[in-house]
Amino acid sequence: MAVTKLVLVRHGESQWNKENRFTGWYDVDLSEKGISEAKAAGKLLKEEGFSFDFAYTSVLKRAIHTLWNVLDELDQAWLPVEKSWKLNERHYGALQGLNKAETAEKYGDEQVKQWRRGFAVTPPELTKDDERYPGHDPRYAKLSEKELPLTESLALTIDRVIPYWNDTILPRMKSGERVIIAAHGNSLRALVKYLDNMSEDEILELNIPTGVPLVYEFDENFKPIKHYYLGNADEIAAKAAAVANQGKAK
């Protein structure tokens, strides 16, 4: 049976991950730890014999720079890359820039958990005159006003990620090309929910660690057979737990 592999990588720790702030579409860069995580992901992939024909990422530099570091370790810096806003992190609306623990102290752990992980729950909206509104950013100049979010739930994130998967990424895989995607916690959760047919309750508890390669294997009909992280299982579990705890009051 022919098996096709897909590799997903959540960007390495960003400066705002380090500061425990809601990031969303804010274009913050990797921390020093995040750069190390991205390089380590590339080394792991090289050790496991992975190489790629095409890469996808978002238009946010924490994902782009993660991909750069991964491909550099693979000696594949030349690889063609498509960047799309449809792989961006979920837009956190008016929460962007706020400290997660302080927000939990103000609104309660459960409210913040719902904002972070609830399926159809949207954080408070931005206004269009807010400097954080993506309509002020030249990289989104070609998007219609309808496409520019004031806030997003995971459900709304799925509405942009999955058509991009079905229309753009999957056809490339079906043509025989080996693909890697470097993206974000919630854009990858959107894809994982779809691939694994997860319920809304199941996705609430899913936390994807930073900078760890997640491998999906597909059968000849491009149905997922299995998935697994590369690396030390205990370290990966600890990193996922740390992601879950970011939204709790101190």
UniProtKB/Swiss-Prot annotation:
UniProt-listed SMART domains: PGAM
Entry GO MF terms: phosphoglycerate mutase activity
Residues annotated for substrate binding in this entry: 10-17, 23-24, 62, 89-92, 100, 116-117, 185-186
Any one Pfam family match given in the protein's UniProt record, by short name: His_Phos_1
E.C. number: 5.4.2.11
One GO process term, biological-process aspect: gluconeogenesis
Annotated catalytic residues: 11 (tele-phosphohistidine intermediate), 89 (proton donor/acceptor)
Site location (Transition state stabilizer): 184
Catalytic function, reaction form: (2R)-2-phosphoglycerate = (2R)-3-phosphoglycerate
Quaternary context: Homodimer.
Family: Belongs to the phosphoglycerate mutase family. BPG-dependent PGAM subfamily.
Function field: Catalyzes the interconversion of 2-phosphoglycerate and 3-phosphoglycerate.
Protein name: 2,3-bisphosphoglycerate-dependent phosphoglycerate mutase
Gene name for this UniProt entry: gpmA
